[in-house]
Amino acid sequence: MGFGTLVAIGVIVFAVVVITIILCLTCSCCCLYKACRRPQPVVTTTTATTVVHAPYPQQQGVPPSYPAAPYQGYQPVAIQPQPGMPVAPYPAQYPPPYPMQPPDPPAYHETVAAGAGAPYPISQPPYNPAYMDPQKPTY
């Protein structure tokens, strides 16, 4: 046997082993499939947290050095415009929406029917190779 034959046999054996493992892992009757698909035991640990709600110690009274009345709560105040700040009137009607895309240029048959003619000025002469400058000789 030559070296090339041994390499070919090795490649074939390797391919057969890989294909066999893939087929065995996908076939439900194979022992490798059952071993890989066996449900893993789920370990659950439960920890209980107990929260104790203790009331905050209340003050017995207002200290004598604090002459102000106790806080009575939030009193909302209407917002008034400041001088120098213009107040915009409420719009009676919303403006029309902007178009989503710019309009397309008119089709060719629409421009011809409207008499617009060519889209370029007619004063431009047509291309004429006779008017080209002769090539200058290179040195």
UniProtKB/Swiss-Prot annotation:
The keyword Nucleus applies. This is Protein shisa-5. It is a single-pass type I membrane protein. The keyword Repeat does not apply. It comes from Gallus gallus (Chicken). The lineage of its organism: Eukaryota, Metazoa, Chordata, Craniata, Vertebrata. InterPro entries: Shisa. Its main location: endoplasmic reticulum. Can induce apoptosis in a caspase-dependent manner and plays a role in p53/TP53-dependent apoptosis. Keywords: Apoptosis, Endoplasmic reticulum, Membrane, Nucleus, Transmembrane, Transmembrane helix. One of its GO terms (biological process) is apoptotic process. It is found in: Endoplasmic reticulum membrane; Nucleus membrane. GO terms for cellular component: endoplasmic reticulum membrane; nuclear membrane. The chain crosses the membrane at residues 3-23. The gene is Shisa5. Belongs to the shisa family. It comes from the Eukaryota. The proline-rich region is required for endoplasmic reticulum localization.
